[in-house]
Amino acid sequence: MSFDNILGQDRPKQTLDKALRRGRIPNAYLFYGQESVGKKFTAIEVSKALNCKTLAPVDSCDRCTSCLKIEKRIHPDLFILEPKKSSPSSRETILKIDEIRELQKKLLYLPYEGNIKVAIINNAECMNPQAANSFLKTLEEPPTKT
């Protein structure tokens, strides 16, 4: 089971496992916690479980083409947004509205290779207000198969 790779976090793992087994996946999850506790890693594992060619939507095999592409971050239905520095000399990182709009365009299409499109927004708190407002609509009314 791919969730075996996630250290600790027993309660969140049980919640995710139960949702996958019941086939009742909400359109969004918020992974919150201290830095380096495995939030992004867990999101990747959920993405693999949702798109695995062998065991989806309950688990991932970590061997099929879909799992391997997600692991390498090259799956065409996986989108990962990371905040970028607002300027070369700045320490502040930000997610801008242009990045969110580009993601929204990509999510409008049906999955190309997998079962479902997955967007992982790392450090979502770094969105500027315009980006956050724009993304709110996607959260409230997600496109099909996302």
Predicted feature residues:
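Sensor-1/coupling segment of RecA-like P-loop NTPase cores
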Residues: 127, 142-146
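Clamp-loader machinery-focused feature within the broader ASCE/P-loop NTPase space
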Residues: 2-130, 137
